[in-house]
Amino acid sequence: MLHIIIKKMQSNKTLFICLIIGAILVTALICSIPLYSSGASTNILKRDLEQIKINTGAFPGEVLAEYPVSFEKSGGIPLDKVNSFEEKEIKAFKQRMGLPVILDKKSISTCNTDLYKLTKLDSQKNYMRLADKLWAIKDFEKHIKIVEGRMYREESADGSLEVILSKRAYSKLDVTLGEEVALLQHGEWYGKGELPKKYIKVKLVGIYEMDNPADDYWRLSQLDYGKAIMVSYKVLTEEILKQYPNWLDKVYWQIGFDYKQIEFFQVKTIRAEFNKLRGQLFNRVTSSKVSATFDKTLKNYEIKEAQLVFTIWILISPVMLMLILYICMVSQLIVIDDQNEISGLKSRGASKWDILKIYLWEIVIISGIALAIGPLLGLLICTMIGSSSGFLEFVGRKALPIKINSQILSYALVAQGIFFVTMIIPVLIYSRVGIVEHKQKAKKKKKIFWQRMWLDVVILLICTYWYYNYARNTQLIQGQSMDPLLYLVATLFIIGIGLLFIRIYPWCIKLVYIIGKNKWSPTAYATLNHLSRMKGSEQFIMLFMIMAIAIGIVNANEARTLNTNRDRNIWCNTGAEVVVRPIWKDFNAFFSVKDMKGNETSIKRPDYWMGGNEYEYEQLEQVESITKVMTEKPERIMVDENMIEVPSTVMGIEPRSFGQVAWVDSKILPVSINEYLNILIQKQNAAFVSSKIKEYSDVEVGDSLRITFRDSKDEYLGEMKVVICGFIDYWPSLANKVYMPDNNNNDPYKDNIMIVCNASYLTNSLGTLRYNIWLKKAPGITDQELLDTIEEKEIEYKNISFATSQMIESRTDGLNMGVNGMLTLGFIVIIAITLIGFIIYWMISIKGRALQFGILRAMGLKQKQVIIMLGLEQLMISGIAVLIGVIIGGITSDLFIPLLYKTVSNVTEVYPFLRFYARLDYYRIYAYIIIILMSGLSIVIKGIRKMKLSQVIKLGEE
């Protein structure tokens, strides 16, 4: 049986090779989902964990278990209970986590103890208490160095306990090196009267400092080294706590796991084990505490991973649909080619199962090849996705940490299931037909299924209804996650219009044919006559090309629009290349002035002076220009006697320098920003106000606004009166809306009235205010170079933002890379299968029309005229399909991309949505199409030249 199957596949090897390619692509695409999501998710996770270290200074892989032994009510020796819990639970927890332990720190503190100085100071009546506890850390000696004195001994000497202090603790505690103090049971003595005779001598023998302050060991810091009195861990556990067991207060296990080794599939296990340890310790002592620096990050990661996988499935769905159609087409061609054989077997008594077995073996062989090659191709696909920075744009980015895992097998099997169903459907349809029925059906002309069922009209009606409802609810969907139906409906819309065009296209050809019936040349006549009787194969290839072009254009426009809007929103939100937020400290003065009603009012005139010296930045060679920008939230805005109760933001700028530094897109302002700045220069009290203000008050240019301010302590700052000189909708770093949720389930996004005025006028009205410093870098200077210079000059700042760095971070985000990569990949795969389908069509077309060519040659047509006829056919089929694909792609982009952007954008974004279409993207698409058309034409010419013309002509004459 296997020999027969292989021989059968060899006899029709071209179609089977095409089918194998389809199966491999399906497997590779589906396998790329878990491969990419695992690599991208792991990358996101590691970056987020590193951010913890940068933002907080904490070690990202730390788990802290706090065991308050003194609060435990059960009987037994406290230290024994601790050792038992550590042996049974802590060690098992480390193993179950599945990560290398690179840091391990165990700390113990005492309670019920007091440390007193042995001598009284002259000014004191009582003995001074220094501390109420001792600390010990296992292997602490390996991470410190003694700067004065010596290290404590690992055993008590002469009945005294040796301790050490950090340099900071030594400067704070009133004790000298070599001095002895008394350690007593709490409650036995309170420092009054004579010192008890029975006490433990504690001697300070050394001062220490960190051996390597940059060591992650010091990030696992639970105790305050500036106060802690450190004793030998061995002495405390083996001597002191055995003699005084109730002195044991708390034990801290601080475990530093190698967070760089965390893989995506370990996240659920890690969180489960962490929660299990928390429960185990809670069951012992309710006041226990188990925390992890990565807990919140891992929780958010699971959400991000689900969103990433979901997004990739959404983006890949149009490609999968095209692949399914492609496999259906090829498998149908194979079955049609075998139809005479199937009918013969059926007529000779073969059962449906006998016929199915042949094709099942074929499916098994093809699936085996796909399983072997598909996952490897999936790896290559993931590499391509990871290096994508836009539509058909790639950069030399560091490869994602992608590994083949067990999950891939399940996805690969799903792919084979899809392939099996797709291929078996045509077999089931044709296996029911006998030889007599086959001959009868061959003579009948019957409309295709989708034409009989009017699927094109049904699909368009569904898409129209969905689009209408979705567009009506754009306010509700803004900022929500991607809707899978959005991509599906866009693809269905393309299919619907494509099918509708294919339905009416033959009628258009007939109309053209009738108009010039007596004028057409023989080649044109033969072409139009053939196309007016267009069959399923021509319709299928036209639909393929229409979908390929339309989806390519939609993908290109979508990627270009999303990427450009995202980048420009970062620029607009930041306002400039670099924004520095200085460190401020205010010294307040109070003055008495008259308020709006003429009453004497005490107002606060703040004078912020510490930090914010822009001259420090002006002196840097790496900075070309700087400007100061002030933003304040006013208490109220008055128009005559009417108060506008809407959130608002006042921005004070220096017009001349602002124009040199600020990033402004001319597309979002009705006139050049210089027009606005010139007015501010000419008129000190001029202001530009959001056009939104017209919805709350009847104001026009020339009207005045009175704006009052209060600080965070609700103290009155002052009043400013400005004249409206124009209205704006967008301004650098200011948003039209702000997020202000309430308890009444109202819309949390409120209008924000933007007011832009002169910084000098604002400070004259309110006093010296805090400001941010906006910088424009000198040509060729990178963000890191500027930051290094600021650090080198020791210029203090509270926060610094780089627009370019934010853009790079956004582009390397796993979700954005996935979107760009899948859009690019989708187009490449569609173009590839369209090329294969196109080649198959022309190969079968030439092979099946040998008789027609013979008749035409016998009638006197030259070979050149036959080639021209086929060229016209290609133009009328492929050329028109390309044109219609471009039109449909443009229409779909205009309709669906704004809706898509609504779902991924934020209501409070500064930059307005704009559609961006690049000619370069279209040129790339056209280049691929030209390759397809030239391939088809070369096959036509090659096929005709290979024909045995003498036999063809003789056949035509007969």
Question: Each PLM stretch: what is its role?
Answer:
Residues 2-323, 333, 387-395, 405-408, ...:
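Membrane transport/envelope proteins' first extracytoplasmic loop
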Residues 12, 325-367, 433-449, 836-878:
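Interfacial "coupling" helices/loops that link adjacent transmembrane helices in transporter permeases
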